[in-house]
Amino acid sequence: MGTNPDIVSEHDLLNEDEEHIGTRPPVFLFPTGRGNRGKTFFTRWVVEDARNMGREVIVADGDCTNQTLSAYFPDASSPSSADQVTVTKWFEELIEAQIKSRKSLIVDFGAGDRTLKHAAHDLSLDTFLSHHGIRPVVIHFVGPDPDDLASLHSFETGNLFAPAATIIVYNQFAIPPHVPPSAAFANSVAKSTVIQQILDRDGEIVVMPILGCAHEIERRRLGFIEAAEGQTKGDLPSLGLIDRQRVRLWQAEMKSRFSNVASWLP
């Protein structure tokens, strides 16, 4: 039986020549986790970084109660209402648009939203995306609270949405200041069979650094590049020279810490 040349396996996607950016497959990136674990903050960084490097990314803000991404990216797509039928139709149209446009897509739903889980169950979503030349990537954002691992279990159980490109992000912001990151996360790593399952299929763990002046950037609704360059919005003054340096160092540290999974990002 012949092989359909239009069908691309996830294994093929993960083993392409990543040195050539033009051949990197478009990415379907799905960040997930409880509230205040850093997924929207990361999303802002990864979209801004990709676009600054000339890579096109479709931004989808599916959080119907708190559309933070839309405040930073005016072109972000959002559902017209919180009705589940409307949200599901919007999500499916996004996927079709991505397949046709060959652009990367990042979808940020509110904590607890089940739209992707339903699609993953109904469509075998990771296989479907891979077959259309899209690399599925899921990023789980967790803190030291063992309850944070519940989301991982829900995606990993029965391989609901468990692509080869799976990243676990420990957010230092969620750790009490007096506790070292290695100690805060040691028990969850050592005792979690689901984390070991992800690592056994070559998933990755990344510790996301803290940006000390993040609240000042958010007050101004600035992008990170804007903040580092001394821009501002409204009546607030621009960041001081020291905080601008903090932003630049944080940006460099983010690039470094995510370097092992750079080919999995938009």
How should these model regions be labeled?
Residues 81, 103-120:
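Switch II (G3) loop of P-loop NTPases
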Residues 31:
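Hydrophobic anchor at the beta1->P-loop junction of P-loop NTPases
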Residues 115-217:
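Conserved catalytic-core segment of NTP-binding enzymes
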Residues 1-28, 96:
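Extreme N-terminal, non-catalytic leader segments
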Residues 37-38:
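Conserved glycine(s) of the Walker
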Residues 41-42:
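Hydrophobic positions on the alpha1 helix immediately C-terminal to the Walker A/P-loop
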Residues 53-68:
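Short beta-strand-centered segment that lines the nucleotide-binding/catalytic pocket of NTP-utilizing
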